[in-house]
């Protein structure tokens, strides 16, 4: 699904989630904390109960005809299409799945505009509505679908949390996503998976100061970013028009830490399924030094004890300069120089791509070899791609650019 197919301009969407939250994973890396997980690797599939509400404007798009129950079933069927797409990514990258609560129909509205509880404010009102209709203890994550041009998770890392005040910024049921055409990947991946990613503990990854609002330690993708927690297509300088359907290393790190050891680990054992699938291994290799203005290759390795088909994702792990809006340049001494890309079956990644190297180039628009001395930090994430209950592994390494050689 292409964002260009939406009826509103591309830049009408803004994620307003506040970033003033400190998760333990943000201050620890390379497994320096023995209780921290950087990966989806504990052989558990976690199921979270989703209370999914909607405004009448959203409901009217999908209600169709029939009885009240039939119309609500039609609306929830569209919600299920969105969540099937979202769950597919969450299960593969995070071993998380979400299911509708039994009483979800009581959160679905359609009919006269203004007949629902929302009147322009969606976060606090969503929490109030869900709690009043189904009860605080009956769900783990609450969200609202509407047709406004924005999204706001209402919190970061609050899923399954104990805070009962919807106005607190820590309530589990205050997420919302709105688009005039709430269908397809432009809605499901770019926006719903993004906002729910915040609710589970993920921060923004885009580094452009035009839309920078992350943790200060997670803005590791140039420009708008291109993975789920970025702003692809809606923030200059744009890497591409739409988000790719995966979470980057920093988001897997933070969300995994939260659901295994943080607030979002607070679910009963009956919602955690143990499985036999073992995590893969990842080896990013040793740190090394290269001359300035020199193309290079990242060579990794991985294996899977169960023989699953593994994929590899090399990503730069350098938070960006707060003052930068442009694509990376060769003289940039801090921040990301290389964009994130979807995983491949090759353990190696050429920087920039081999096709460019063969022409003598050392850069593309979003992949630039530095001409100054600096460090480039990289992560290698290995996925085993099991349909439900996928596991990941990661390893970190550093390339030091010698500013006097080359």
Regions found by a protein language model. Give the residues of each.
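Exoplasmic/lumenal beta-rich domain surfaces
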Residues: 99, 311-372
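Short, solvent-exposed loop/turn segments at the edges of extracellular beta-sandwich modules
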Residues: 383-390
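The catalytic-center signature of Zn2+-dependent metalloproteases
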Residues: 101-123, 164-245, 319-324
